[in-house]
Amino acid sequence: SKDKALREISKLDYINDGDDATETDLGCSGIWLMPVNPSPTYHKYDVADYYGIDETYGTLDDFETLLAECDRRGIKVIMDLVLNHSSSQNPWFLEACEYLKGLGGAEPSAADCPYFDYYHFSKEQGGGYYPVEGTDWYYEAQFWSEMPDLNLDCEALREEIAEVTKYWLDMGVGGFRLDAVKEYYSGAPQSNIDFLKWLTETVKAQK
């Protein structure tokens, strides 16, 4: 209920009440939220919707209220941003798989289905690759079969990521904590550095 949400938010005063003259709070200037996006798992590190809030934590309106109350107290909210992989239930992945099922032997094209390039699909089953049901294609998922790896070289995906960060920053989020950054490009540290540089520049330009 709304009243319950307000009672819970009042507990932010224990973290920082926004009054430098008091000594009853911890004086914290930031809160790091572990993944809060919609996800089918308990840990939420497989995002099904990068623009939503998992119902476990309330609604998008509840989140906006939290951001406003934190801002009033001088508390920045840092979100966990999972970019190494998504959930297998993410519409991007589901649409890409449906597209592959309908090819009938034709070659895939990102022009026909942009989400095909969001992931690593292959006709060969390498290590950490799993079959796309109903096709002769495989997808990469190094952590778990239900966490398909994102193709961070894809320009369309990078544009999508930029939309995601702008969406949350515009709402009032103070920044992002990145998960599994060493695995963005496993075994290729310079590629990781280059991507993180791009992401940093992108986010700084949005703030």
Would you name each region that the model predicts?
Residues 166:
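C-terminal active-site rim and adjoining tail of enzyme catalytic domains
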Residues 174:
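Receiver (REC) domain switch/active-site residues of two-component response regulators
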Residues 1-162, 170, 181-207:
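Acidic/aromatic-lined carbohydrate-recognition and catalytic surfaces
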